[in-house]
Amino acid sequence: MARKGILGTKLGMTQVFDENNRVVPVTVVKAGPNVVTRIRTLERDGYSAVQLAYGEISPRKVNKPVTGQYNSAGVNPRRYLAELRLDHPDAAAEYEVGQELTAEIFADATYVDVTGTSKGKGFSGTMKRHGFRGQGASHGAQAVHRRPGSIGGCATPARVFKGTRMAGRMGNDRVTVQNLLVHKVDTENGVLLIKGAVPGRTGGLVMVRSAIKRGEK
């Protein structure tokens, strides 16, 4: 069986009780339905993957090149397109163009990896962005309490090294959280209850895939 994946929407967090009456914090993800719009094979494309489409959108908001992709697949335009890389070249045979994927594909899954876009924090200083300690609060410190300090030498090396941690835009990055437990799969409503937090804001797009490090199929 190929590694499974589906596009969905983060609906927010809540808490449920397990069989031992312990509180479990879960993230509610509306998973799918997705439709397969293209299958990439090792022979033709150099890698194995399936292209998934998700979300409603008015056809007049889709440009002509993208509309042509949907027309060739014989499906209505969707808001999002993403590729799911397959872990084995023969796994593409398990999919076909026009096939619909729902939350039911994770009925037997135990752990998943969730990818999303983290919340943007705006321009942030080094203490918030990188966890710097800051400088002295007193004993002669004047208006330098939250400054980063030295960023390099003067004559040598006479430059700032690439990758130096400094203030800047924080968040709005692609983030993957691995090995999250699937607490429940509600196939009737197309919802996944995933233990713990997943990246992104409420209403954000997420990709849920079977956990690669645990060998989930």
Curated annotation (Swiss-Prot):
Part of the 50S ribosomal subunit. Forms a cluster with proteins L14 and L19. One of the primary rRNA binding proteins, it binds directly near the 3'-end of the 23S rRNA, where it nucleates assembly of the 50S subunit. This is Large ribosomal subunit protein uL3. InterPro entries: Ribosomal_uL3 (IPR000597), Ribosomal_uL3_bac/org-type (IPR019927), Ribosomal_uL3_CS (IPR019926), Transl_B-barrel_sf (IPR009000). Pfam families: Ribosomal_L3. NCBIfam families: L3_bact. Keywords: Ribonucleoprotein, Ribosomal protein, RNA-binding, rRNA-binding.
